């Protein structure tokens, strides 16, 4: 056997082993960081939740691809609001053409919610989704900045126009790049196609809660009660101004 060929084979094997080892190290490091965050903040930590992955895939925004996974799941509940953050992953394509997509997502659930179903995502990257939903973009002539920044779709346009008043439209127009989807009592939120660093997770949850309160028509007082996990969620909800959300 040609020595040069043997060296090439050995070199390729070394590279493959190094890539696998690096991937394993990064995975373990993130798990440890998320566990530490859960311990500090009082969240519940689950390494992997297949049921959650299935529930997230029911949202149009996360319905693409296959081999869906929800890992490093952080969850808590307070004052009737359940908050769940996860590293959501899915794959598009197969074989040499496959690509893995990862992002941090927040799922908020409350039996007190009764929002119309809708999908809100940045304009310009939602045309494929528009075809999937079979619905047209709902524009607002009074808020061209919002309509230029976002694609808004719903099977109930009348309710959406009633829900998205001036304050809500201005809020989102000032914060381009957000993705929000409502299924009535459940709201999905994420703001980028990447995983957030652990230190950004608490503010990510607070931003999502502020958006939830805005959509629900609440701006200040939250239900009273002892918080369970979010280190004073009732105080956060009471003090958080939707105009101060950092995105």
Features from the language model and the residues they span:
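Feature marks short, highly hydrophobic, charge-poor N-terminal signal-anchor/signal peptide-like helices
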Residues: 1-11
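Transmembrane-cytosolic junction motif
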Residues: 17-41
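Core hydrophobic alpha-helical membrane-spanning segments
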Residues: 10-18, 111
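Charged, low-complexity intrinsically disordered regions
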Residues: 32-55, 60-247
